C-alpha cells in the first residue's frame, strides 16, 4: 500500500494581505526561506511514495532539495475553498495508484518531518491525525476508504470526517507545532 504526501498551497492568502503583508503569505520570508519552502521541504523529507503540492492562486518556488521529489497539482477552483484543493490532490493520488494520503498545509512551516512520518506510519485506522500537546493539528492521514466522505467544496476538509466518524480516527502525538502563518503578526510571533 503506497502513501502520498499532499501539501495544500493553493489559497489566496487574503488574511495576510489584509493584516499588512506584502505579497502572498506563502512567499513571505521565514527564517531565511519562504514559508512554503519550509512546509514542502518538511513533507518531502518524510520520503513517502510521492509528494504533491497543490497550488492555485500563485506560482510557488520549490525548495532546492525537494525539486526532484515534488510534483505540482493545479487547482483552478482554489477560490471555492480548501476542500477543492484536497480533492485535487486526492484525485492525483488516486490516479497514481496510492491507497492513502497524508495532508498538510503550506502555511505551517513548524510541522516537522517527523510528524509527517509518524502520521504516515499510523495505519490501524482509516484516519490518523497529528496532535501537539494533546491538540489536533496537521498533517492528517486519510486512507482511500474515507475519501468519498470528504467535502468537495468549502473551507473544511478532514475535520468533517473526524467530527462525524470519530470511530475511524487515531491521534498521533508529534513533535513541533501545527501553527498557521495567516497574518503578519503570526509571522512575527513564530520568527
Q: Can you annotate each of these PLM segments?
A:
Residues 2-136, 144, 149, 166-175:
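Nucleotide and nucleotide-moiety/phosphate-recognizing core
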Residues 1, 5, 148, 153-191:
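Conserved alpha/beta core of the MobA/IspD/sugar-nucleotide pyrophosphorylase nucleotidyltransferase superfamily
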Residues 138-142, 179-181:
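Short glycine- and hydrophobic/aromatic-rich loop-to-beta-strand nucleating segment
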Amino acid at each position: 500500500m503506497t502513501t502520498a504526501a499532499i501539501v495544500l498551497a493553493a489559497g489566496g492568502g487574503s488574511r495576510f494581505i489584509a493584516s499588512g503583508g506584502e505579497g502572498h503569505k506563502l512567499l513571505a520570508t521565514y527564517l531565511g526561506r519562504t514559508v512554503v519552502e519550509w512546509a514542502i521541504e518538511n513533507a518531502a523529507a518524510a520520503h513517502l511514495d510521492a509528494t504533491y503540492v497543490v497550488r492555485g492562486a500563485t506560482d510557488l518556488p520549490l525548495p532546492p532539495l525537494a525539486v526532484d521529489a515534488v510534483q505540482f497539482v493545479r487547482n483552478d477552483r482554489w477560490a471555492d475553498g480548501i476542500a477543492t484543493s484536497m480533492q485535487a490532490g486526492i484525485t492525483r493520488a488516486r490516479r497514481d495508484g496510492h491507497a492513502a494520503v497524508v495532508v498538510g498545509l503550506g502555511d505551517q512551516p513548524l510541522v516537522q518531518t517527523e510528524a509527517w512520518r509518524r502520521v504516515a506510519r499510523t495505519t490501524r485506522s482509516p484516519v490518523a491525525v497529528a496532535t501537539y500537546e494533546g491538540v489536533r493539528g496537521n498533517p492528517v492521514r486519510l486512507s482511500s476508504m474515507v475519501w468519498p466522505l470528504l467535502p468537495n467544496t468549502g473551507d473544511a476538509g478532514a475535520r468533517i470526517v473526524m467530527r462525524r466518524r470519530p470511530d475511524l480516527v487515531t491521534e498521533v502525538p508529534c513533535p513541533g507545532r501545527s501553527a498557521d502563518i495567516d497574518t503578519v503578526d503570526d509571522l512575527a510571533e513564530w520568527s
